[in-house]
């Protein structure tokens, strides 16, 4: 059976912008998540069209109906959503279920929700959160599970090389990937 291949990089966006990226990142997925206001279907349509044109995989956060309506490649379940449990049998075979977690308890919840990949964050120090995992704790959390893990949180030019020693499938970002094309990832490019 053909398994849906996930991108190595993910970019989180909350609205459509004409030039979302200042670079051409190969093997990229875009996750639309907008928690501040009602989801704008016009923005979703424009993002989906942009992704189709650029051959970028497109995912929608927290709304299965919209993900199916706009034929996204999958759904992203944020760490705060503890209710959704999806049955892969009811979805198309290439539909991916991905989620995010901050600790072991949330990782287990995402696995129970059917997530094949998990964004684990924050890896490094970020402005909005004083707590972060760090390299050792991050690796200890990921080694216990067979799921694919993505590094998220605080990734910058100064610490990008550290990703090479992590037990990860790829990385995700909000601002770093918009501005930079990661050049120093070795096995990830």
Model-assigned labels for residue ranges:
Residues 1-19, 189:
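N-terminal amphipathic alpha-helix/helix-capping segment at the start of soluble metabolic enzymes
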Residues 7-13, 28-32, 58-60, 75-77, ...:
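Hydrophobic faces of well-ordered beta-strands that scaffold small-molecule active sites
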Residues 11-24, 62-65, 102-109, 156-161:
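Short, acidic/polar
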Residues 18-19, 29-90:
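N-terminal active-site wall of soluble small-molecule enzyme domains
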Residues 30, 67, 110, 118, ...:
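Conserved, mostly hydrophobic/aromatic
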Residues 43-59, 82, 87-103, 131-156, ...:
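Alpha-helix-loop-beta-strand connector modules within alpha/beta enzyme cores
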Residues 75-86, 119-131, 155-189:
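Glycine-rich phosphate-binding active-site loops on the catalytic face of alpha/beta enzymes
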Residues 94-124:
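Internal catalytic-core helix/loop-beta-alpha segment
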